[in-house]
Amino acid sequence: MNYTKLLSVSILLLCFLFLSYCSAKKRKMTILIHMTDAQKEFFIKEVVKNFEKENDLKIDVISAPNIDEIEKILLTHPDKISLVKIPFIHSWSLVRKNLIVPLNDFLGNYDLGFFYNDYILTWFGQKDKIQYFLPRKYETRIMVFRKSKVIEAYNSFGKYKDSINSILKQINGYGLPYNYKFDRNPLHWDYYDIFVLGFIWSQLKINGMVMPRVAHRGKKYSGTSLRVIDRIYQCSGDSTAFLGMDGPSVVDAFEWEALYTYANIYNKKMWEEEWSGKNIWEGFASDDVFLSFLTQIDCVYLIGTGKDGIEGYIKDKSDIGMTLMPTGCSVQLDMNGNVLRKGKKSITTGGWWWAIPKSCPDLKLTYRFYGFITSRSVQLEECSRFGMIPVRRDILKNKYIISDNGWISKIFRVSYKQIQINDKNMLPSHINMNRIADIYLNALFDIVVNRNWSSMNSIPVIDTSVNGDSI
């Protein structure tokens, strides 16, 4: 009897040890991300946890503190990372360093066909017909402004027109372009209109303060370099001009940045306090910013949704206008006072990829996880809550995203229209993209922020011979 009991206990103990061993050996994935707190909470609690339950595995989600640290963490983290979320601007550096597994290495033509059929703009993540990246979200910048402050500037234009002409004449030898009229519709604005707005705002005493109130990111990181890169494309540049770092479009881009700084159009705090996106949202709330160029997620946090802890920064949401980017042009005018070089509204389409690192222990499982986190149901929920532009073809045909007149739908409609205007403009898939962007960033800080545009501290004259909100 004692022997039987001992045998039973031994069997139970062995079963327990076996189950413990199996539990310890449960499959594991490690995902590297950079997300806002609200997006991260949604991703972990409402997406990752469901996949864990369905597939009996453990998923660890680790976060990079900023976008410029992602590659470093990927290279140094002790765990084998299965999937990484990477911005366009840093993506090709990973390919150059042979850190990414292309889909072609483990998917056959049949599965690749489904991938290309399900997702849009996949060719953005290709090089030499090899698919390196999987769409996470596409984004672009749009122009965001305070409607009431535009009206105030419009009504004050006559008072300040002579002063505006005077300062511009120092730079282009003429002043405002010939027969210039300040259009009330932001959809028709170009860089000169932004100058006019910014100059007037810099003269007005608002809440007891006189200061410039146009801003963009000013922190020394890749998010700021995109402003200069976008300007190059708006000034009719292309990837050749961008990579060559030369030509009229590059000159025009830097001249406008220098002019806005020289003429006190930009809020100096953006440089002095090294503003990122959050600082701009706060600037709108404190009346330090009346106009900027923001991504979709910027707009969501600025305006707020009332969900996911995203309450917004603006008290009067109806005072926020958003429309397409202004049209680029040259600072320089011809002998008749007309813009010497006309530009476009198009900028670059960017966003974020998912990528499978060489460290991934299970390629097929990771790809199945990617399919889960970009499934129709997950994308519908995530896009409706965070203003993301969907990457699935079937969702773009779904009226749920764009049918109502709410803020999320407005952000989506304007941004998607801007992406359509951008057409094929994207950051080139150059293996040294990181280095090139850094050169532009350093040039911006050297020439513009540090005012090294000439020995006389004046801007050099370089001879290089959707539906908007109607205010």
Could you tell me what each predicted segment is?
Residues 21-96, 111, 157-169, 452, ...:
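Conserved N-terminal structural module of periplasmic/extracytoplasmic solute-binding proteins
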Residues 130-136, 141, 167-243:
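Extracytoplasmic/periplasmic solute-binding protein
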Residues 195-201, 223-231, 235-285, 325:
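Glycine-centered hinge/linker elements that transmit conformational signals in sensory
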Residues 265, 311-394:
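Extracytoplasmic/periplasmic substrate-recognition and gating elements
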Residues 334-340, 348, 383-449:
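Long, aromatic- and glycine/proline-rich binding clefts that accommodate carbohydrate-like moieties
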